[in-house]
Amino acid sequence: MRHYEIMVILDSSLEERTVAPSLDTYLNVIRTAGGSVEKTDVWGRRRLAYEIDKKTEGIYAVIDLQATPAAVAELERQLRLNESVLRTKVIRPEVR
């Protein structure tokens, strides 16, 4: 298992209170593969640095998790298929 950090930018037309439950359904991919979700941090609505699909605002969420590379790849694939997800970024933080 490796440690990953995923940042997701969602469409600002969504209600902020529905963001965490909707992300939780996607995170079941990680749980069924034997991984664990350590923390889900919803930053809320923020202005984008540049327009994405003619949108100037997005809802940011950061997720810390432990998972296999295959499970993270499947999660990223499912997030890309969702129309309300504007961008995703998966990183492996440096070990200190």
Swiss-Prot record:
The record, for Gene3D superfamilies, names: 3.30.70.60
Name the SUPFAM superfamilies for this protein.
Ribosomal protein S6 (SSF54995)
A cellular component term (GO) from this record?
ribosome
One of its GO biological process terms is: translation
Q: Which UniProt keywords apply?
A: Ribonucleoprotein, Ribosomal protein, RNA-binding, rRNA-binding
Q: Does the keyword rRNA processing apply?
A: no
One MF term from GO for this chain?
small ribosomal subunit rRNA binding
InterPro entries from the UniProt entry: Ribosomal_bS6 (IPR000529), Ribosomal_bS6_sf (IPR035980), Ribosomal_S6_plastid/chlpt (IPR020814), Transl_elong_EF1B/ribsomal_bS6 (IPR014717)
What is the name listed in the Swiss-Prot or TrEMBL entry for this protein? Small ribosomal subunit protein bS6
Q: Native species of this protein?
A: Salinispora arenicola (strain CNS-205)
